[in-house]
Swiss-Prot record:
Family matches, as PANTHER family: TRYPTOPHAN SYNTHASE, TRYPTOPHAN SYNTHASE-RELATED
Function: The beta subunit is responsible for the synthesis of L-tryptophan from indole and L-serine.
Domain of life of the source: Archaea
HAMAP family from the UniProt entry: Trp_synth_beta (MF_00133)
Gene3D superfamilies, sorted: 3.40.50.1100
Encoding gene per record: trpB
Name this polypeptide is given: Tryptophan synthase beta chain
Annotated source species: Thermococcus onnurineus (strain NA1)
EC number per UniProt: 4.2.1.20
Keyword presence, Lyase: yes
Positions bearing N6-(pyridoxal phosphate)lysine: 110
Protein family: Belongs to the TrpB family.
Length: 443
């Protein structure tokens, strides 16, 4: 069972949650002064239209025609499936649906914001976009977006993933991007971390620092971010806006689930539904899933912190483990991040979104069952949502409830097979920090 929307039903506007949040978003702080960040400084880092969108209180923002045309070319609208074989295997009365972002040409949801960011950069005359990537999904998406828009792309990829997932960098190079393992010897911050540990596995926080340092050296370059900030999450709401239309062919969901690193794929599916709950039109339950190795939602502190490891970004008020936290080299590279989207942090604080955390071995076990029943190999990140959906379906079985579960399968794992090989060979290790910098006041 699946629902596929015609191109004519593709969303024409993104949904911006800022005017509907239960409290105002705290302003970003200048890392040099700890005062609210002036927009002029943000304009040196980001494309100007993205800075405008980041601050906008407009509830809906038009998707440019060029971006919508490219959305159609890369696979939007994406299909929504019912996981009937998984339901049978679990012997649950629950009905499980998933939005499949792996159907895009790059294999994940990341292309949704990559095309938008590259479009606005090209319109401004920017010549190069520089970014970070964890597992490589975001780097792949921006590399293609740059190729389609005629903009050069440079990617700093977390070193652990650079070697765990070698074919990701092959695809990025095929699309014309430059790619470097992070930490690298190309930046001052990269050399600092390499001097401390020549085999440093890196992480999103370090890669972000390197990308921003790189951008600040080149007036014709700007930074593109794959998650966390509001404009990125807003671009992803095409997922949830499509899903709302598709679920009309089936039934209304009771619970909505997504994995979380910075928060973009969760927000993409959930935020259009969150609006209905905030408006009092529905009583949806929202579950955000993270790895126990990077538990920013379940164990982090809500405070101002840097978005990167080197302290170059504005400080944001968010759930954080502390920007100095060393995230272990789990295979879900896209979830190896110390912080969290500020908008999602607020929703968690108000009890609208409930976070849960899992070890990677139990996540891969859930992914194996999903692959055997539904035929799709989930990305390790997306497999966290699979695990939560399975647990929820088993709970419904215990309680005899015919619950309707919707989750975001944000990408496929066909280029993440080293993690699956390690899982099948019994080589996966679970990580859970005993101490966290944020709990010691180190932010």
């Amino acid at each position: 069972m699946k629902a596929v929307l015609p191109d004519s039903k593709m969303p024409k506007r993104w949904y911006n949650i800022l005017p509907d949040l239960p409290e105002p978003l705290a302003p970003p702080l200048d890392p040099e002064t700890d005062e609210p960040m002036e927009s002029e400084k943000l304009l040196r880092i980001f494309a100007s239209e993205l800075v405008k969108q980041e601050m906008s209180m407009e509830r809906y923002i038009d998707i440019p025609k060029k971006v919508r045309e490219l959305y159609a070319k890369i696979g939007r609208p994406t299909p929504l499936f019912r996981a009937t074989n998984l339901e049978k295997a679990l012997e649950t009365p629950a009905r499980i649906y998933f939005k499949y972002e792996g159907a895009t040409v790059t294999g994940s949801h990341k292309i949704n914001t990559a095309l938008a960011q590259a479009y606005y950069a090209k319109k401004q005359g920017i010549e190069r976009l520089v970014t970070e990537t964890g597992a490589g999904q975001w780097g792949t998406a921006l590399s293609l977006a740059g190729a389609l828009m005629g903009i050069n792309v440079r990617v700093y990829m977390a070193r652990a993933s650079f070697y765990q997932k070698p074919y990701r960098k092959t695809i990025m190079r095929l699309y014309g991007a430059e790619i470097y393992p992070s930490p690298s010897d190309r930046t001052e911050i990269g050399r600092k971390f390499l001097s401390e540990d020549p085999n440093h596995p890196g992480g999103l926080g370090i890669a972000i620092s390197e990308a921003i340092e790189d951008v600040l050296r080149d007036e014709k370059a700007r930074y593109a971010l794959g998650s966390v900030l509001n404009h990125v999450l807003m671009h992803q709401t095409v997922i949830g806006l499509e899903a709302k239309e598709q679920m009309k062919e089936f039934e209304d969901p009771d619970v909505i689930i997504g994995c979380v690193g910075g928060g973009s794929n969760f927000a993409g599916l959930a935020y259009p539904f969150v609006k209905d709950r905030l408006d009092g039109k529905a009583d949806y339950e929202f579950i955000a899933v993270e790895p126990r190795a990077a538990p920013s939602m379940t164990r982090g502190v809500y405070t101002y912190d840097y978005g990167d490891s080197g302290g170059l970004t504005p400080k944001m008020k968010m759930h954080t483990l502390g920007h100095t936290y060393y995230v272990p080299p789990i295979h879900a590279g896209g979830l190896r991040y110390h912080g969290l989207a500020p908008t999602l942090s607020i929703l968690i604080n108000h009890g609208i979104v409930r976070p849960v955390a899992y070890h990677q071995t139990e996540v891969f076990e859930a992914a194996r069952l999903f692959a055997k029943t539904e035929g799709i190999v989930p990305a390790p990140e997306s497999a966290h949502a699979v695990k939560a959906a399975i647990d929820r379906a088993l709970k419904a079985k215990e309680e005899g409830k015919e619950e309707v579960i919707l989750f975001n399968l944000s990408g496929h794992g066909l280029l993440d097979l080293k993690g699956y090989e390690d899982f099948l060979d019994g080589k996966l290790e679970d990580y859970e920090p005993e101490e966290l910098p944020a709990l010691r006041g180190e932010v």
